[in-house]
Amino acid sequence: MKLITREIELKLKKNMALPEGEREPVVKFFGGGACTWLISEKEGDILFGLCDLGLDGAELGYVSLSELESLKFPPFGLGVERDSWFVADKTLSAYADEARELGRIAA
């Protein structure tokens, strides 16, 4: 499965025109059982969003699309997947606030 389709790419570009506090995640990725990424921006290969590696809570930051595409999780070597059913219902900053309270991303 392609992680970023043309439609998603266009939505990510539109998000860049909005003030930071109004940007909603456009796409959700997951993998490895506990890893979750909510992505709101893309510039080249670099994505920005809320990232949770299942260790000690989520944080806002940057991640490389090519790195996500290359990840393989044991024991079966499955890669990162896109949640086809994800629809944001709040801003990225609201998801981040909620993740701080819960200790994980709830999306």
Show which residues each predicted segment covers.
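Helix-rich interaction surfaces within compact, conserved domain-sized segments
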Residues: 59-107
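N-terminal domain-onset segments
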Residues: 1-33, 105-107
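Short beta-strand micro-motifs enriched in acidic
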Residues: 40-42
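Generic structural hydrophobic/aromatic packing signal, biased to beta-strands
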Residues: 27-29, 49, 63, 68
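Catalytic Cys-His active-site segments of thiol-dependent hydrolases/isopeptidases
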Residues: 46-54
